[in-house]
Design a protein with these regions (language model features):
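Short beta-strand/loop motif that positions the catalytic acidic residue
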Residues: 251, 257-259
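Conserved alpha/beta-hydrolase "acid-adjacent" motif
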Residues: 264-270
């Protein structure tokens, strides 16, 4: 009887195992994709007042809207350089919107357009998307455009996030004969030189980032047949001087500043002057010792958190764990690494 019982149990186990393999096999062959993988956000267009505005709207309509303004001489698709944290951004519920500037990418060059023209383009796009209030995220040469927008519609701006940029570009020291010297004029025909990062930049930890930056530079200066025409870039540098000091006294919301102390384009005095030009804003500064002109990417995780929560909380990695701490919770005797733990080769 006992041997018969074992035989029945063995047979049952064999049948169950074969049934499991059958199900597994069926599952393998039934997992066909229900949609295509994304190759990045689609560039859309809006015809308005005899001109075409090119823009990207990346996120759900229910997400928190953020107008992203890329650096000097970038196209609407510079937004792709933020996609290495796209999944995290989606988890936070942030909707990124980018509007292309005059003469770059797909947008024809018009020498009569100025910074106010771009600000109106941004307003037209957010109105078209039925967005009332939104945050601004400006990096490097995009910072003055963010200030211009805030000066025109301060009541619609929930927060401003300025990374690797200056409170004022158009100073007397920088403006010579009405424009800033174009140090890029001889290299824009070489996208790999224009948008190349130094070998020690942390962005090289991100697969494909540098190549995406090369593609962005090529798109900016060749996409619409520009053939590396220097005029749009010269014009943009002139606009900084034409604007000079942008009056942002009417903005009273939160302003977050992100800067590296080793950034060759930003000095200590520049970092100190934000209060002067945003006298009524609630200013929070994130200063990163020894870091350069790539904090907008290295600390994108912190920027996204600030846009979402608008608090003074710091994202740190300690002992392999991601922690979000209030500034007064930081124990300065402990070893923290700012940002997500994924940035680290080893836990601290």
């Amino acid at each position: 009887m006992r041997s018969n019982q074992y035989s029945r149990e063995s047979i049952f186990c064999i049948i169950f195992f074969l049934f499991f393999l059958l199900l597994l096999n069926v599952n393998v062959y039934s997992q066909y994709p229900e949609k295509f993988d994304s190759l990045g956000p689609t560039v859309q267009s809006l015809s308005n007042n005899n001109k075409i505005i090119y823009f990207i709207d990346d996120g759900k309509v229910t997400d928190k809207p953020v107008v992203f303004i890329g650096g000097l001489g970038t196209s609407v698709r510079a937004i792709r350089l933020l996609d290495f944290l796209r999944s995290y951004r989606e988890e936070l519920g942030l909707r990124l919107i980018s509007i292309e500037r005059n003469g770059f990418g797909q947008t024809p060059f018009n020498p009569n357009f100025n910074m106010n023209t771009y600000a109106r383009d941004v307003i037209d796009i957010v109105n078209h998307l039925d967005i009332e209030n939104f945050s601004l995220f400006g990096i490097s040469g995009g910072g003055p455009y963010a200030s211009k927008i805030a000066s025109i519609i301060p009541e619609r701006i929930e927060s401003i996030h300025m990374a690797a940029t200056l409170p004022v570009f158009g100073t007397k020291e920088r403006c010579i004969e009405g424009k800033i010297n174009n140090i890029y004029k001889d290299i824009i025909k070489y996208p790999m030189k224009y948008f190349g990062f130094s070998g020690d930049s942390p962005i090289h930890q991100i697969d494909g980032f540098q190549d995406t930056a090369y593609d962005e530079a090529a798109r900016t200066f060749y996409m619409n047949g520009q053939m590396a025409n220097i005029e749009p870039l010269d014009h943009e540098l002139t606009l900084y001087c034409n604007e000079g000091v942008i009056n942002t006294e009417s903005f009273s919301g939160s302003l977050y500043v992100y800067a590296g102390t080793a950034d060759p384009l930003i000095g200590d005095r520049d970092i100190e002057k934000w209060e002067k030009y945003y006298p009524n804003a609630d200013i929070i500064k994130r200063i990163y010792t020894g870091e350069g002109h790539d904090v907008q990417y290295r600390h994108l995780d912190q920027i996204l958190i600030d846009i979402k929560y608008k608090k003074n909380e710091l994202l740190v990695c300690k002992n392999g764990k991601n922690l979000l701490l209030n500034s007064d919770q930081l124990n300065h005797s402990d070893k923290y690494q700012f940002g997500l733990c994924v940035w680290q080769d080893s836990d601290i």
